[in-house]
Amino acid sequence: MSEFCQKYGYDIVVTSTWRKYPEWERCLRNAGLRSGIKIIGATSLPTKDRATEISDYLSNHPEIETYLVFDDDESLLKNKNDDTSELGTLFDEKGVHGDNLILCNKERGFGEEEYTMAVATHLSLKYRNANNVSTAPLASADAEGSIEATIELLYSVGELSTSLLQRSFKIGYGRAATIIDSLTEKDIVFVENKNGRIKYKPLLEYEEAKAKI
């Protein structure tokens, strides 16, 4: 996981919706334990308190340059009545740079199933410019590179699961197999179910089942 984060340039993941997304909570916790990634959880705090906790932490850790914020509250980034934001105002006050802040948020057009895709979109190097700022469209499930990055992330932290893949991807066997082959040395294959979604099976199990047909 540490190699993955170095590759994609992320030092920290900040999330305030872990309890709503248990699969990602487990994934992120495992990632933190295995790589030393700094993770902040502020699930139960009000918006202003969450913003304060995040900005305080980052102001005390200037070495952290890029961070993700998971939150369902749009006002954390932008208030309804003007262009200011809880985080933006506090960042200015505390001297925290916000150029690399990424907010993943339901109000921006995606639901629980697409959280995986949104993260992967932002982790893709294809959407990072010369200043190391993400230019990826938020929550674009079809964004080039997002599926590959998601699978790589899940595989790297040992969380490549049938349920996550079935919920996150609607792609055919050929595309999925091509992506996964480069990561798993062909020890996992993807098969498309009757609903058009995919699941994975160990290669040996798949070949044995296929031979019986």
Please tell me what each predicted stretch does:
Residues M1-E3:
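Short catalytic helix/loop segments, enriched in acidic residues and glycine
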Residues C5-R26:
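Substrate-recognition element of Asp-dependent hydrolases with the DxDx(T/V) motif
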Residues Y10, L33, I188-V189:
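Short aromatic/hydrophobic-glycine micro-motifs
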Residues W18-Y21, E74-S75, Y206:
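Short, internal active-site loops enriched in acidic
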Residues R26-N131:
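C-terminal cap/substrate-recognition subdomain and adjoining C-terminal extension
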Residues A136-I213:
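Terminal-proximal interaction/regulatory segments of ATP-powered molecular machines
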